[in-house]
From Swiss-Prot:
Record field: catalytic activity: (6R)-10-formyltetrahydrofolate + 5-amino-1-(5-phospho-beta-D-ribosyl)imidazole-4-carboxamide = 5-formamido-1-(5-phospho-D-ribosyl)imidazole-4-carboxamide + (6S)-5,6,7,8-tetrahydrofolate; IMP + H2O = 5-formamido-1-(5-phospho-D-ribosyl)imidazole-4-carboxamide
GO molecular function, one term: phosphoribosylaminoimidazolecarboxamide formyltransferase activity
Keywords attached to this entry: Hydrolase, Multifunctional enzyme, Purine biosynthesis, Transferase
Name the UniProt record assigns to this protein: Bifunctional purine biosynthesis protein PurH
Cross-referenced HAMAP family: PurH
Signal sequence, start to end: none
InterPro entries given in the database record: AICAR_Tfase_dup_dom_sf, Cytidine_deaminase-like, MGS-like_dom, MGS-like_dom_sf, PurH-like
Lineage, opening ranks: Bacteria, Pseudomonadati, Pseudomonadota, Alphaproteobacteria, Magnetococcales
This protein's pathway: Purine metabolism; IMP biosynthesis via de novo pathway; 5-formamido-1-(5-phospho-D-ribosyl)imidazole-4-carboxamide from 5-amino-1-(5-phospho-D-ribosyl)imidazole-4-carboxamide (10-formyl THF route): step 1/1; Purine metabolism; IMP biosynthesis via de novo pathway; IMP from 5-formamido-1-(5-phospho-D-ribosyl)imidazole-4-carboxamide: step 1/1
Gene name tied to this protein: purH
Organism from which the protein derives: Magnetococcus marinus (strain ATCC BAA-1437 / JCM 17883 / MC-1)
Stretches assigned to the MGS-like domain: 1-147
BP-aspect Gene Ontology terms: 'de novo' IMP biosynthetic process
Length: 532
């Protein structure tokens, strides 16, 4: 370790910069800087030398060339313990630079803005910043390099602990972080530019695609005990409500299957603005309900769709969990609970269940910037597609039967349509009064999915001691078109009175005729929701 005497500071994100540099100044560090960063430091009472004065070469080309100079990169790359390097530096008047604090032009944020032009994107490609970061990181044994404001406190703590020197282990960590950051930065530039056509217009998908994820946690094992696994988050992180942004408040470490299933529950509960509850088992919803103002009622209805399958499941809620809801949930063994918040009494009650995993995801239901790409790994390759985020445009439903749905039926059809989107194909959902009654998931034939959903609803009603048909007057949703009329016949036989489906089959007329024969209302969405 060597004492830090000179730092080069040039940042786009100035968060926490002034107190950090004031802390450096307390250790006798002098500053080199450029442009707006230099102005900020001077306005804060710090002495700063312009890089152009240090190099003896002016900034030029509208600021495109500031730090690309041998006196900068020689000062960063020269090995302090190499006599030849030191001799050459002396001969050319190159002085060592002991610290680099640089973060990059906001390319990712720029291209994320609607209407970003090629010229705007190009001007936000940083050249000097990555060059300095890479030079400093290559010589990390002698140079401390900081690219993330979150590391400022750690660096100052190390300087205080080591008399103005930065710990060698921390230097190595910071260097690794630099190469991860510059790799992600270059990937963002490459992905965006390679998606442009020859006229510079955004295309569909880039010719090459590079992604970066950051490790969140290791795991005991993967989907099965013989598989190794770890959980990674997008880098840079998304602001969207997700498992990657969740805070675990208690319980055992999340397993591979916990995270996979919890993601399905969270994505489904995000569909609803009213108080909603979702119960998921093996990534499929086994119960969903919405209630105008009562989360407890919504949870009870969701659980009671299929209480047998709910045992050991995942629960997602889109409102703060109070003690009344907590008491109801506590009657059932569950693996994970997801909610935006919990009141103190609820937390105290859940604390008695030490293994229960409790997750807080604050921005459930809040419109945020989202990652719009869906990645599916196949052996030897990657399938890349838009995420299935499209909502039904208002007025887009097409009534195709002689009878139109009533207002109540339409509410249930739209509810069931939101649910079926999150069920593995082939998928059928029966619903009534804003709650699921039966879910048929992952079947090779659509009619079998319908039969399973009917059986689940009838079995649950029978177990509960109910005599009436639970599906009488229900709405039925299908994630894809009916290839034959048998699915509609099965729904009518079960008691359903309304159907929502994409349409588009060569036998649509036959299917519509079946619905008319049974006095059912049917609407087409023109949109399919396969899920594999």
């Amino acid at each position: 370790m060597a004492k830090i005497k000179r730092a080069l500071i040039s940042v786009s994100d100035k968060t926490g910069l002034v107190p950090f540099c004031q802390g450096l100044a307390e250790h006798g560090v002098s500053f080199l800087s450029t442009g707006g960063t230099a102005r900020l430091l001077r306005e804060s009472g710090l002495d700063v030398m312009d890089v152009s004065e240090f190099t003896g070469f002016p900034e030029m080309l509208d600021g495109r060339v500031k730090t690309l100079h041998p006196k900068v990169h020689g000062g960063l790359l020269g090995l302090r313990d190499n006599a030849s390097h030191q001799q050459q530096m002396g001969e050319h008047g190159i002085e060592p630079i002991d610290m680099v604090v640089v973060n990059l032009y906001p390319f990712e944020a720029t291209v994320a803005k609607e209407g970003c032009t090629l010229e705007e994107a190009i001007e936000n490609i940083d050249i000097g910043g990555p060059s300095m970061l890479r030079s400093a990181a290559k010589n990390y044994r002698s140079v401390t390099v900081v690219t993330d404001p979150a590391d400022y406190a750690r660096v100052l703590e190390s300087l205080r602990a080591h008399d103005g020197q930065c710990d060698a282990g921390l230097n190595a960590q910071l260097a690794r972080k630099v190469y991860a950051r510059t790799a992600a930065y270059d990937a963002a530039i490459s992905n965006w530019l390679s998606a442009l056509d020859n006229e510079g217009r955004p295309g569909a998908f880039p010719e090459t695609y590079t992604v970066q994820f950051k490790k969140v946690q290791g795991m005991r094992y993967g989907e099965n005990p013989h598989q190794s696994a770890a959980f990674y988050a997008e880098s840079p992180p998304s602001e969207e409500a997700s498992l990657a942004t969740a805070t675990q408040l208690q319980g055992k470490e999340l397993s591979f299957n916990n995270i996979h299933d919890a993601n399905g529950a969270l994505e489904l509960v995000k569909e609803f603005s009213k108080p909603a509850a979702v119960v998921v088992k093996h990534a499929n919803p086994c119960g969903v309900a919405v209630h105008d103002g009562d989360l407890l009622a919504a949870y009870r209805m969701a659980r009671d769709t299929d209480p047998v399958s709910a045992f050991g499941g995942i629960i997602a809620l889109n409102r703060c969990v109070d003690v009344a809801v907590a008491k109801e949930i506590a009657q059932l063994f569950v693996e994970v609970i997801i909610a935006p918040e919990y009141d103190e009494q609820a937390l105290e009650l859940f604390a008695t269940k030490k293994n229960l995993r409790l997750l807080r995801v604050p921005n459930i239901g809040v419109a945020t910037a989202v990652s719009t790409m869906d990645l599916k790994r196949v052996t030897g390759g990657l399938l890349l597609q838009d995420r299935d985020l499209k909502q039904l445009p208002e007025g887009s439903l097409k009534v195709v039967t002689e009878r139109a749905p009533s207002e109540a039926e339409m509410r249930d059809l739209l509810f069931a349509w939101k649910v079926v989107k999150h069920v593995k194909s082939n998928a059928i959902v029966y619903a009534k009064e804003q709650r699921t009654l039966g879910v048929g998931a992952g079947q090779m034939s659509r009619v079998d999915a319908s039969r399973i959903a009917v059986w689940k609803a009838q079995d649950t009603a029978h177990t509960a001691g109910l005599r009436e048909n639970p599906l009488l007057g229900a709405a039925m949703a299908s994630d894809a078109f009916f290839p034959f009329r048998d699915g509609v016949d099965a729904a009518a036989k079960a008691g359903a009175k309304a159907v929502i489906q994409p349409g588009g089959s060569v036998r649509d007329e036959e299917v519509i005729a079946a619905a008319n024969e049974h006095g059912m209302a049917m609407v087409f969405t023109g949109m399919r929701h396969f899920k594999h």
